[in-house]
Amino acid sequence: MGKPTGFMEIDRQTSREIAPEERIKNFNEFHIPLHCDEQQAQGARCMDCGVPFCQSGMMIGGMASGCPLNNLIPEWNDLVYQGRWDLAAKRLIATNRYPEFTSRVCPALCEAACTCGMATGSPVAVKENERAIVEYGYESGTIHAVPPPARTGKRVAVVGTGPSGLSVADLLNKRGHKVTMYERADRVGGLLMYGIPNMKLEKWVIDRRVKILKDEGIEFITNADVGRDVSAEELKENYDAVVLCCGAKKPRDIGVPGRDAEGIYFAVDYLTSVTKSLLDSDFADGKAVTAKGKKVLVIGGGDTGNDCVGTAIRQGCTGIMQLEMMPCPPETRAPGNAWPEWPRVRKTDYGQQEAIAMFGRDPREYQTTVKEFYKNEAGQVCGALIARLESKVVDGRRMMVPTGEEFSVECDLVLIAAGFLGCESYVAEAFGVDMTPRGNVADVKYATSQPKVFVCGDMRRGQSLVVWALREGRDTAAVVDESLMGYTNL
């Protein structure tokens, strides 16, 4: 490495965040990048550790340790330190075709497995370096459209333009196959466009990449709902292969009394309405579900729940509570959660930070669930009965069960962010592919039960991270390519 003692001499530094009180005034990204010299110094913190777990992508204890894309992290960290930004960009995109997405929305599995983090408590700022590299790549022209030099004559349809779909389409196109992508929404991006709010991923970032993909020869057809508006038979007849990348979008519901009250929404529907209204009219059309002037109850403690908290605060809610079924995680790793496992520790994300700044308390209520929704005479939700939970072993299984303690809260808007139960079934039914008991499309190495129909991403593996969707797209592209050509060089 360029500076073997860098991790001892230089402190970890990340991008500056706009204060919560200021950033909630708009839906813009709120991270201010480091100066170039500061970023290069962060590259020097990468150790010559011998075994770089940061790029391993191993599964330990059922969770990923290190980057699933096997990014060449020590290489481009050192290149950042040396100021060799062009080569850093080339080495980055050698394994990750979409670093502008992962550097904004990935939870940084690489940093959790960083040896420097284990040794000093402060991992290398890998995610920040990644973002600096990719933005340099765009500004310098290092990242630009490179159409394939020749075409194979094969045609592939990709259903869904989320991260897995974009990943598989990009590689198959570069191989020379003619790729057409179908998207049921009005904009390309899937989860990236409408499932992640603008302050985490501004949508011009997606549009910038899509322009390159178009210039490279990929065709995008929006407002095309395959399985309804576009028949499966049409795609199978007109293409040599079809790849299903429709995500895991069937939300888990809360089946309790009062669920039929007005003012209760699934989180993804809420977030979609807000982002679409923002992009269409800067909210002038009044079509966004709004939390303005309302007391909001968010059910679910994951990333989507946090996004709902941040969005509701930006809309002007007057109060917010977030329910989490599980106990509060510890502040530091428990003895049974050793490095390089993913740290199961308490994390206060941007939405919770903003709630603390606005309302003086963390919005999360751990070990709770909804027992009943209350509604007024007009049928509008006006409150909820909350049950406290505890962890117990029941019939040999540990689960969260009611303690008997209950309390009521007022709420005018309820957002259900309780996870997903697999993919929406109509696309799978249209293609006649087998399903798993968990509601995902069954496969053998990404091939479904139907000839020349493949599947990847959350539609295959279930709800997951963007980085895993990109990995799935990369792996699936090689399988599809081999099926078309008899061999693959992807």
Specify the residue positions occupied by each region the protein language model found:
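Beta1-alpha1 glycine-rich phosphate/pyrophosphate-binding loop at the start
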Residues: 5-32, 41-44, 70-80, 90-92, ...
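Beta1/beta-strand and adjacent pyrophosphate-binding region of the FAD-binding site
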Residues: 151-161, 292-302
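Feature captures the FAD/FMN-dependent oxidoreductase FAD-binding
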Residues: 87, 150, 155-159, 207-256, ...
